[in-house]
Amino acid sequence: MGFEGRYVKRLDTDLQRKALRRLRYIEAAQTLEDLRVPPSNKLEKKTGDLKDFYAIWVNAQWRIIFKWKDGDAFDVQFIDYH
């Protein structure tokens, strides 16, 4: 994976910090089960149009979704869930 960790002006700084923490969890994970900790990640397999994705919570509104294969996350996206 790999990300730059730069802040953007359009999003709240606290939200960005939480998202960056979650991205670090994803980057460090060796298995999907690793992402069940902490429980606040609320790891879930998506359905419907997003059936190929997994998601973890950033907060009630925002999710990080990603695909997982052979111990690596890819197609990582930060989405407004509502």
Where are the regions that the model predicts?
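Polar low-complexity intrinsically disordered regions enriched in Ser/Thr and small residues
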Residues: G5-V8, K51, F74
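Short, intrinsically disordered low-complexity segments
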Residues: L20-R21, L35, W62
